[in-house]
């Protein structure tokens, strides 16, 4: 049995790891949670004594080599790895990016999923932050390409779109345009849904109060979030950092028993298989068509929720494959 353990001090990453943070056995691996302000010191002793291998979050503490474990950047891509850690060969990330090779992905799957039913009074839930600060060049880029982007949201994950339109920019500069464009698209999607569904659309995040005063305050309590997601349609416009179907927010929705409706991601075919056509959207028409079918048909919503449960109920096997990729050597 191979020992693997989480080794990080601060609790704010707990919500990003979701059910994967819980101690359990995956095949030949026993995964223990030694994170948090007290257990963290036990993990430091184990690292010092070279017992097992650690997974740290954001390089805190820094794991120096693969024999000790990995530095896991759960909220980002290779572009989020700090410069002082770039030379290490044991950095792994959670999110794919259309402009990168994506050969350091540590894929986490939704596990221990609740088998639930849809609420009788279905709501559309969306939790996120929003920041729309742009400079003149970024605003011009958005206005120039807005019509094309709104007709096909997935174009933002086409590397040739960026290479053709920002050929004079380096990777980090392009990534800033990428993040801003995804934020502006998120705003357009929310605006569209608020107009159509009004009180049925529950918007959560203090940043949104600049635009809609009925937006609810941000909630960082994982247990409360799970209650909110459970049995409702849960909108997921994807990570601003990159394009992955199964990243922290999506996993939390699925594990909570929420019926996820997701913007088409870079790896959608790999993870969603035949469920793509029922849950994923690339434009406003597809989004509205999906939501209209679900919000007005409790039976269909329950059928799809059950399909999601069955699709991921054996994800512990997939999780073992992820661990094998990095810890079998």
State each model region's role.
Residues 282-300:
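C-terminal "capping" alpha-helix adjacent to the active site of nucleotide-linked donor transferases
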Residues 274-281:
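A short acidic/histidine/glycine-rich donor-binding loop in glycosyltransferase catalytic cores
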Residues 13, 38, 178-185, 286, ...:
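Soluble or luminal CAZymes and related metallo-dependent hydrolases
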Residues 254-255:
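Short alpha-helix at the nucleotide-sugar/activated-sugar donor binding site of glycosyltransferases
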Residues 5-8, 13-16, 33-35, 78, ...:
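Nucleotide-sugar donor-binding catalytic core of glycosyltransferases
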Residues 26-33, 50-79, 83, 87-97, ...:
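Active-site proximal beta-strand in glycosyltransferases
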Residues 1-28, 42-53, 194-197:
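N-terminal subdomain of nucleotide-sugar transferases
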Residues 295-329:
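A charged, aromatic-enriched C-terminal amphipathic alpha-helix characteristic of glycosyltransferases
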């Amino acid at each position: 049995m191979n020992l693997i353990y989480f080794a990080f001090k601060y609790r704010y990453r707990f919500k990003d790891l979701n059910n994967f943070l819980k101690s359990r056995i995956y095949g030949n691996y026993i995964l223990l949670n030694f994170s948090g302000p007290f257990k963290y010191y036990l993990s430091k002793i184990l690292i010092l004594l070279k017992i097992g291998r650690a997974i740290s979050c954001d390089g805190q503490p820094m794991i120096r080599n693969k024999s000790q474990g990995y530095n896991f950047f759960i909220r980002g891509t290779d572009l989020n790895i700090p410069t002082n850690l770039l030379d290490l060969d044991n950095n792994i990330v959670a999110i794919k990016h259309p402009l990168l090779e994506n050969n350091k992905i540590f894929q986490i799957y939704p596990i221990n999923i609740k088998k639930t039913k849809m609420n009788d009074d279905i709501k559309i839930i969306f939790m996120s932050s929003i920041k729309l600060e742009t400079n003149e060049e970024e605003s011009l880029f958005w206005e120039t390409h807005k019509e094309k982007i709104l007709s096909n949201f997935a174009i933002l994950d086409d590397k040739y779109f960026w290479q053709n339109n920002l050929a004079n920019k380096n990777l980090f500069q392009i990534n800033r345009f990428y993040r801003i464009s995804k934020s502006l698209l998120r705003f357009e999607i929310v605006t569209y849904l608020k107009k159509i569904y009004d009180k049925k659309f529950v918007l959560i995040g203090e940043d949104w109060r600049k635009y809609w005063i009925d937006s609810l305050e941000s909630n960082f309590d994982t247990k409360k979030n799970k209650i909110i997601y459970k049995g409702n349609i849960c909108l997921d416009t994807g990570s601003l950092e990159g394009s992955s179907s199964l990243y922290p927010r999506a996993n939390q929705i699925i594990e909570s028993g929420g019926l996820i409706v997701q913007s088409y991601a870079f790896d959608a075919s790999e993870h969603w298989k035949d469920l793509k056509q029922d849950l994923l959207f690339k434009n406003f028409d597809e989004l509205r068509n999906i939501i209209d079918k679900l919000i007005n048909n409790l039976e269909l919503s329950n059928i799809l929720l059950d399909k999601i449960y069955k699709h991921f109920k054996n994800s512990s096997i997939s999780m073992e494959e992820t661990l094998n990729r990095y810890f079998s050597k």
